Design a protein with these regions (language model features):
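Primarily recognizes the serine-hydrolase "nucleophile elbow" in alpha/beta-hydrolase
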Residues: 191, 197-249
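Terminal targeting segments of Actinobacterial cell-envelope proteins
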Residues: 1-17
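Short substrate-entry loop that stabilizes the transition state in hydrolases
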Residues: 114-167
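A domain-start/cap signature at the N-terminus of enzymes
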Residues: 21-24, 35-121, 176, 280-282, ...
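Alpha/beta-hydrolase-fold serine-hydrolase catalytic core, especially in secreted/extracellular enzymes
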Residues: 54-55, 287-291, 298-299, 306-309, ...
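N-terminal Sec-pathway targeting helices
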Residues: 12-28
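The feature captures the conserved acid-bearing segment of alpha/beta-hydrolase catalytic domains
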Residues: 226-315
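Alpha/beta-hydrolase active-site loop
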Residues: 169-193
């Protein structure tokens, strides 16, 4: 019986068993990780096509578009300096802050897909009371931006600077107008190479009231071409200080669009947009605006207006002055509402 190792026999290495155990454990762990990843890859579907939003609720039955804003990070975009203007390569910019004389709010610019080698127009979209569409641009606003893009125009959607209760455009007409016009002049027209003869105002509900009571009535010189679309509102101002040129009176397109069911009897829409639109259209027509039109839509309430289709028709009319648009004044729903209607 050996009591010690032979001189020529290697002594056993201490810790060799531990090394073997660690190697076995590591191998098992690697196998487990590989199996887990393989299972995950096997059960994770490949990325599908980019989500699309249907524009059918806004009047464009066969049009779908990529949601703007809702499925992408917000960004203020590159910083401009030295008088540089946006040109090729510009894209959507969301929640950009703008301050004017102590009043601050924000705006979106939708510029994806614009051909900057051609003249570029602009649509200013003014939201209704509550600013819901500003906070959720992935639906209606995305479809309006697609309409604007189809006419090679950017869409600018500002949020009212109003912070008193429910955000509105019409409760502080002068203050909101000063901020809005400063935004247009100091940011939008200063930073983007735009054709001002293709400038459009597009307002819904309270945004339409802001256009008719203030922007057209007192600040019409802002519109050097294009026109205004007033959806679900746009009443008659008590007075008007604007002195439009003969060219403006003859060429600017002013269109009101309202549902015959939009008379304020719906508890969810207590504003009588029907009467407001009728009065606003009559006021501007009497004031000498030659290209006014109004469409009263049968069976339509405050929430069912085909706004994207109407914007497209109005912009097309602006590009083709000699053509009459059936969409803007087509039968059978062109008659004004009867007074005293229940």
């Amino acid at each position: 019986v050996k009591t010690h190792a032979d001189p020529g026999e290697a002594a056993p290495r201490r810790g060799s068993r531990w090394v073997v155990d660690v190697a076995i454990l590591t191998g098992a762990l690697l196998v487990l990780v590989a199996a887990t990843l393989a299972a995950r890859w096997a059960w994770t579907p490949a990325p599908g096509p980019e989500e699309q939003v249907s524009c059918a609720p806004y009047g464009l039955e066969d049009v779908s578009t990529t949601p703007r804003g809702g499925a992408r990070p917000l960004s203020t975009g590159p910083v401009l300096s030295g008088g540089l203007r946006w040109a090729e390569g510009t894209s959507d910019r969301l929640d950009v802050t703008f301050e004017h004389e102590g009043t601050t709010s924000s705006y979106h610019v939708f510029a994806d897909g614009i051909d900057w080698s051609e003249p570029v127009g602009v649509v200013f979209r003014l939201h209704g009371d509550g600013a819901y569409e500003y906070e959720h641009p992935g639906h209606k606003v995305s479809c309006l931006a697609e309409v604007a893009r189809s006419h090679n125009a950017v869409l600018v959607a500002p949020r009212t600077p109003d912070r008193q209760g429910e955000p509105t455009w019409w409760e502080d007409l002068d203050g909101n107008a000063e901020w809005f016009l400063a935004l247009a002049e100091q940011r939008i027209f200063a930073e983007y190479d735009l054709d001002r003869s293709r400038t459009w105002l597009h307002g819904y509900s309270g945004g339409a009231e802001f256009i008719s009571y203030e922007l057209l009535a007192d600040r019409a010189d802002f519109l050097q071409g294009g026109g205004a679309v007033l959806s679900g509102g746009g009443g008659a101002p008590s007075t008007g200080t604007s002195e439009p040129t003969q060219e403006q009176l003859e060429q600017l397109v002013l269109h009101w669009d309202v549902g015959l069911e939009d008379d304020g009897t719906d508890p969810y829409a207590p504003f009588d947009a029907l009467s407001a639109a009728a009065a606003g259209h009559a006021w501007y027509e009497d004031a000498g605006w030659a290209r006014t039109s109004v469409r009263y839509r049968e069976g339509v309430d405050h929430f069912e207006l085909p706004e994207a289709r109407v914007l497209d028709a109005a912009m097309t009319a602006g590009e083709s002055p000699g053509e009459r648009s059936a969409e803007l004044s087509g039968e059978p729903s062109t008659e004004p509402p009867k007074r005293g209607r229940d």
